[in-house]
Amino acid sequence: MGSGYAKKKKEAKIMEQQFLEMEASLEQKRYEGQAGNGLVSVVINGKCDIVSIKVQPTCLDPEEPEVVEDLFRSAFKEAKEAMDKEMSVMRAGMPF
């Protein structure tokens, strides 16, 4: 096999290393979303795992639990959109 094969193999190894580094950094990244003027806050990492949830007691009404549910969904969506935006920039710089 010629030098073309060796070059491609080396490029593949570099790409694999870049991918592994990017994947490892995703767990360290944090994205926050808030809803209801900060009544609910959700923080996720770059793998979309929830890291923390904060709920202000003033929005906890046992008569209307759907309010907190809606705020949580909105806060999570905001955090995920921030993550997706950064991920698209990161992917644009990758050769694959």
UniProtKB/Swiss-Prot annotation:
Keywords linked to the UniProt accession: Cytoplasm, DNA-binding
Role description: Binds to DNA and alters its conformation. May be involved in regulation of gene expression, nucleoid organization and DNA protection.
Protein's name according to its UniProt entry:
Nucleoid-associated protein CCA_00330
* Entry annotated with the keyword Repressor: no
Q: Which family does it belong to?
A: Belongs to the YbaB/EbfC family.
What superkingdom does the record give?
Bacteria
Which Gene3D superfamilies does UniProt cross-reference here? Nucleoid-associated protein YbaB-like domain (3.30.1310.10)
Under the subunit heading, UniProt states:
Homodimer.
One Pfam family, short name please? YbaB_DNA_bd
Q: What GO cellular-component annotations does this UniProt entry give?
A: bacterial nucleoid; cytosol
Which PANTHER family does this chain map to? NUCLEOID-ASSOCIATED PROTEIN YBAB
Give GO terms: molecular function aspect only. Answer: DNA binding
Q: Which subcellular locations apply to this protein? A: Cytoplasm, Nucleoid
* Tagged with keyword DNA-binding: yes
